[in-house]
Structure formats: structure tokens, C-alpha cells
Amino acid sequence: MTHQTHAYHMVNPSPWPLTGALSALLMTSGLIMWFHFNSMTLLMLGLTTNMLTMYQWWRDIIRESTFQGHHTSAVQKGLRYGMILFIISEVLFFTGFFWAFYHSSLAPTPELGGCWPPTGIHPLNPLEVPLLNTSVLLASGVSITWAHHSLMEGNRNHMLQALFITIALGVYFTLLQASEYYEAPFTISDGVYGSTFFVATGFHGLHVIIGSTFLIVCFFRQLKFHFTSTHHFGFEAAAWYWHFVDVVWLFLYVSIYWWGS
């Protein structure tokens, strides 16, 4: 589309939804191959395809919004509804994991020893690394709000500082989570406790990585003066997503780490 004479969202034909779906298939298949056959070839191919898709799709959206001016107020309204529905779908996604956890923990079967945590499982101390992780994510929630308010007030330097702090806290959280996984006294194959713990916290960790990537893109866009105090939906969507990640972690901490231990 070279010229647009209306306010509505008419997108160009794009291959990226198809390559994104293909990369998701390759990654999930690759994860199974890695778990069962210790082969990471398919997983690496999926990750590479996914990163290329992300780069090119983001590039196209930035070009359409910032340089071609296609993101009118009507288009932004549609994108807001889309992001809200996406976050609602993510809430339902995590609801499934919490359902699995509570289904197993509220009425433990004789195979689990009739208790929770199951016999033989030594849970992680919720007052050590998990509590630090909670503090880190809550602090990142404060800094992303600071960044948002700075952007709305036109304070570019404060916005960049706050956004950088948020990204650093997100990376720190990921490193802490990785070290916790490495030192955990149980694995994903240790029955229903191990599987619910690693799948729920692992998918949350994946969302933190996705959110951090989203914020890094926003950071470089802000360096190039892409956002104004009235036109910054890309950053707003990233902030909404980050707050969602924060809230999910609080539920995970209270349910799996604290109550579940």
C-alpha cells in the first residue's frame, strides 16, 4: 500500500503470520525432539525462524506506523482492542496451568503419598530466590510506570532511563530463574509436581523474555524519536504486557512457591 485515503486498518499481504506459525510448529516439535532424543537441531531451526519473523514483522509495523502514518486514531483503537483480547487469551492460557496445579494439590492421590508436596519432593524455599524474583518484578512494574508517565510528560531522558532499568530488571529476573532451575532438587519428569512447576514457571519465564524483547524494541525506537507524548501505542502495548507478566508472577508465587510448599 503506497497511499491511504481513509482512516481504517487495511494491511498489506504479509508472509509473517505464516512464517510465525511455522516457527511455532518447529519450536514445539523441536522441544519434543530435545526432551526425548536429545537433539536440538529442530529447536534451533525454529528459534532462528522465529527471530527472523519477529525482526521483519516489527520492521514492517514500524514502517507502516511511524514512516507511512497508517496508524490513525481508528487503527490505534482497533489495535488496543486486539491487545486487550490477546492479554485475555493469555489469562485463560495460564488459568489452565493453575487449574492443573490446584487439581493435583487440593486432593493429592495415594500415588503422591496423599500429601502435597508429594512424598520425596523437596520444594524450593519461597523466602529465598523466589522472593527476590518477586521484588525484582514488582520493581520493574514501578519503573515501567515511571517510563510511561515520563513519555506522556515529554521527558525523553527520564523515559529512556526508566525503560533501561525495566529491561535490566527483566534480564536479571531471567538469570535468577535460570539459576533456580539449575539448582532445583527436582526435574520436570518428577511426577505431577515437577511438571506443573516447570511448565507454569517456564511459560511465565518465556513471557518475561518476550516482554523484555518488546521493551528492547521500544528502547531503540525511543532512541530514534519514534514516540511522542500522544502517539506511542507500541510502548503502551509493551507496558500492558509487562504488567500482565507481573500479575501472573504474583499468582505463581503465592500458589506454587508459597502455598504449594
From Swiss-Prot:
Coiled-coil annotated spans: none
Catalysed conversion reaction: 4 Fe(II)-[cytochrome c] + O2 + 8 H(+)(in) = 4 Fe(III)-[cytochrome c] + 2 H2O + 4 H(+)(out)
Topology feature Mitochondrial matrix, residues: 1-15, 67-72, 153-155, 224-232
Pfam families to which the protein is assigned, alphabetical: COX3
Positions on the Mitochondrial intermembrane side per record topology: 35-40, 106-128, 184-190, 257-261
PANTHER family assigned: CYTOCHROME C OXIDASE SUBUNIT 3, CYTOCHROME C OXIDASE SUBUNIT III
The protein's role, per its UniProt record: Component of the cytochrome c oxidase, the last enzyme in the mitochondrial electron transport chain which drives oxidative phosphorylation. The respiratory chain contains 3 multisubunit complexes succinate dehydrogenase (complex II, CII), ubiquinol-cytochrome c oxidoreductase (cytochrome b-c1 complex, complex III, CIII) and cytochrome c oxidase (complex IV, CIV), that cooperate to transfer electrons derived from NADH and succinate to molecular oxygen, creating an electrochemical gradient over the inner membrane that drives transmembrane transport and the ATP synthase.
Name of protein: Cytochrome c oxidase subunit 3
Organism, as annotated: Damaliscus lunatus
